[in-house]
Amino acid sequence: MIIYDSILKQKVEFKPIREYEANIYVCGPTVYDDAHLGHAKSSISFDLLRRTLKSLGYKVKFIKNFTDIDDKILKKMSQTGKSLEDITNHYISRYKADMYALNVADADIEPKATTSLTSIINYITTLFENGWAYKIDDGIYFDTSKDDKYLSLSGRKDENLIARVASKDEKKDEKDFVLWKFDENWYDSPFGRGRPGWHSECVAMIKDHFCGSCEFEIDIHAGGADLLFPHHENEAAQCRCAYNKNLAKYWMHNGFVQVNNEKMSKSLGNSFFIKDALELVPGEALRFYLMSSHYRANFNYDIDDLKSSKKRLDKIYRLKKRLIGVKTSKTDAKFKKDILDAMSDDLNISVALAILDEMVNNANAKLDNEPKNRDFKQILVSNLEFVKELLGILYIDEFKWFQWGVDDSLKQEISVLIDQRNMAKKDKNFILADQIRDKLTNMDISIMDTPNGTMWEKV
């Protein structure tokens, strides 16, 4: 497996700490609002990484956290009058529903900041007692001047930092960042009541759930490119100082999602929520669209491109529909190798999808000439099952896929007409059966009689 290491800024061979085991930590969302397409892009990108490693035979341990106490959440509490738990539980539930729609599997462990407080406090205590942190009026801060490797992760220069760090007169240095914010409304600690700073959460969670036994805590730390500085830089600094080891052997970052070629963000007011996109296409089509460009590339969201991407996926589902009732056999070894080789090259999705498109085109051509070639059909079913597990698509029933967007009242009317047609056929009233089929055709509904009954789709 070849991956791109954000720190070395080059592709490298993935050599895990323990052979054929991959320990991965991905920074999850701060849960104060609905998830946007940036969250979707990141989640899909590293879901593809996880699936690829599993397909290569790796045992993968995958952790994604939830930041469930933060300034933005406190602001939401003030605006709504709701409790911290009500807000965060609500948005965690919404986030998980969005991920389910995108076929992004739950992480193996999903720690929250509020359930990791003991570890976070112990970890900050280690930094404070060993001189890596200091206390001022509003909290405990990490002293970046004590870490001679600070900025080695992001490669930034001091003069380029001011726009991305919080300024405070009492800090020893602009780069210093808060580990614990004093606040009488929250949690007890040896330093005083308060709550953890954002940058102090992930290292404690990684230490809790991985406990690396060598110079690295984990194999891969991943997240959006906007997290490289300051978040990941600050995490790496804390781990070096607290435990005298590197946090991760490899760092991977996905590109930005843009709208009109501007970075999408809530602060710019141009966020596009996942739930809004799911009004336009099925979740799997949104997944297919967002993963269709390389994970490291910036992605410009366009509604027309989204709809075109669904049509590309429609074609694969139409092949799946031609294989109804066919059992699996062995996957085409060359197809499996070629598509897995592409994904093993730093998740080269463009090549992988080109291979998939070619397989679909060739399959349709051969089925047109050999519609009863069962051995070939069985290989195709196996190919599509492999694609399902590797790329996270083709989970939906092939007819239900083409029923998306049809409202419930029309579905009910179609069901009644199909029942009437089946009864007419049973009574050998084939003229009436044909009339009902014609009526459905005029409604842009195509029907197909299968061993499992009469199926329909929206044309």
UniProtKB/Swiss-Prot annotation:
<feature type="binding site">
    <location>
        <position position="27"/>
    </location>
    <ligand>
        <name>Zn(2+)</name>
    </ligand>
</feature>
<feature type="short sequence motif" description="'HIGH' region">
    <location>
        <begin position="29"/>
        <end position="39"/>
    </location>
</feature>
<feature type="binding site">
    <location>
        <position position="231"/>
    </location>
    <ligand>
        <name>Zn(2+)</name>
    </ligand>
</feature>
<dbReference type="InterPro" id="IPR015273">
    <property type="entry name" value="Cys-tRNA-synt_Ia_DALR"/>
</dbReference>
<keyword id="KW-0030">Aminoacyl-tRNA synthetase</keyword>
<dbReference type="GO" id="GO:0005829">
    <property type="term" value="C:cytosol"/>
</dbReference>
<keyword id="KW-0862">Zinc</keyword>
<keyword id="KW-0547">Nucleotide-binding</keyword>
<keyword id="KW-0648">Protein biosynthesis</keyword>
<dbReference type="InterPro" id="IPR032678">
    <property type="entry name" value="tRNA-synt_1_cat_dom"/>
</dbReference>
<dbReference type="GO" id="GO:0006423">
    <property type="term" value="P:cysteinyl-tRNA aminoacylation"/>
</dbReference>
<dbReference type="InterPro" id="IPR014729">
    <property type="entry name" value="Rossmann-like_a/b/a_fold"/>
</dbReference>
<dbReference type="InterPro" id="IPR015803">
    <property type="entry name" value="Cys-tRNA-ligase"/>
</dbReference>
<dbReference type="InterPro" id="IPR009080">
    <property type="entry name" value="tRNAsynth_Ia_anticodon-bd"/>
</dbReference>
<comment type="similarity">
    <text>Belongs to the class-I aminoacyl-tRNA synthetase family.</text>
</comment>
<keyword id="KW-0436">Ligase</keyword>
<dbReference type="Pfam" id="PF01406">
    <property type="entry name" value="tRNA-synt_1e"/>
</dbReference>
<dbReference type="Pfam" id="PF09190">
    <property type="entry name" value="DALR_2"/>
</dbReference>
<feature type="binding site">
    <location>
        <position position="235"/>
    </location>
    <ligand>
        <name>Zn(2+)</name>
    </ligand>
</feature>
<dbReference type="GO" id="GO:0005524">
    <property type="term" value="F:ATP binding"/>
</dbReference>
<keyword id="KW-0067">ATP-binding</keyword>
<feature type="binding site">
    <location>
        <position position="266"/>
    </location>
    <ligand>
        <name>ATP</name>
    </ligand>
</feature>
<keyword id="KW-0963">Cytoplasm</keyword>
<dbReference type="InterPro" id="IPR024909">
    <property type="entry name" value="Cys-tRNA/MSH_ligase"/>
</dbReference>
<feature type="short sequence motif" description="'KMSKS' region">
    <location>
        <begin position="263"/>
        <end position="267"/>
    </location>
</feature>
<feature type="binding site">
    <location>
        <position position="202"/>
    </location>
    <ligand>
        <name>Zn(2+)</name>
    </ligand>
</feature>
<comment type="subunit">
    <text>Monomer.</text>
</comment>
<protein>
    <recommendedName>
        <fullName>Cysteine--tRNA ligase</fullName>
        <ecNumber>6.1.1.16</ecNumber>
    </recommendedName>
</protein>
<dbReference type="GO" id="GO:0008270">
    <property type="term" value="F:zinc ion binding"/>
</dbReference>
<keyword id="KW-0479">Metal-binding</keyword>
<dbReference type="GO" id="GO:0004817">
    <property type="term" value="F:cysteine-tRNA ligase activity"/>
</dbReference>
